[in-house]
Amino acid sequence: MGVVTQIYDTPAAVPPTRLFKAMTLDFHNLFPKLVDSIHSIVFTQGNGGPGTIKKITTIEGDKTKYVLHRVDAIDEANFVYNFSITEGTALADTLEKVSFESQLVEAPNGGSIRKVSVQFFTKGDATLSEEELTANKAKIQGLVKLVEGYLLANPDY
């Protein structure tokens, strides 16, 4: 098994408290409304704390896929949320799992910076192409920007 790590920051024009609520605490309610391909997010174990498992079901075209999202750590006071994608039909065959460590910090402009470390645990000698890594980074940063846009348009959320 190999491990490939990506580290990057994504700025957002909303404070950490609002972004953390939307991207972490209310993720299961908000993302199916914002992301067309997400059909549902269901708790299969736990209540949101470490050890909780959420089943995320997506529909793309005529294909239904899912992943299991396991909460590894959550620290509301410091805006930390760590989770792993551990299995599912939407997890690439070459991957054992994908782990995310994220923290929101306050930006000088009153917004946020989402600091993320992503670890891809590959099966056997499998590798990830630069295109796959670039696409993954764009997808994750795009989700932050999608939520940012929603929060800016809905200041009472």
Swiss-Prot record:
One of its GO terms (biological process) is defense response to fungus. GO terms for cellular component: cytoplasm; nucleus. Pfam families: Bet_v_1 (PF00407). GO terms for molecular function: abscisic acid binding; protein phosphatase inhibitor activity; RNA nuclease activity; signaling receptor activity. Highly expressed in leaves. Expressed in roots. Expressed at low levels in stems. Keywords: Pathogenesis-related protein, Plant defense. It comes from the Eukaryota. InterPro entries: Bet_v_I/MLP, Bet_v_I_allergen, Plant_def-hormone_signal, START-like_dom_sf. Involved in resistance against the pathogen Phytophtora sojae. Inhibits hyphal growth of Phytophtora sojae. Possesses ribonuclease activity in vitro. PANTHER family: OS08G0374000 PROTEIN-RELATED, PATHOGENESIS-RELATED PROTEIN 10. Belongs to the BetVI family. This is Pathogenesis-related protein 10. The gene is PR10.
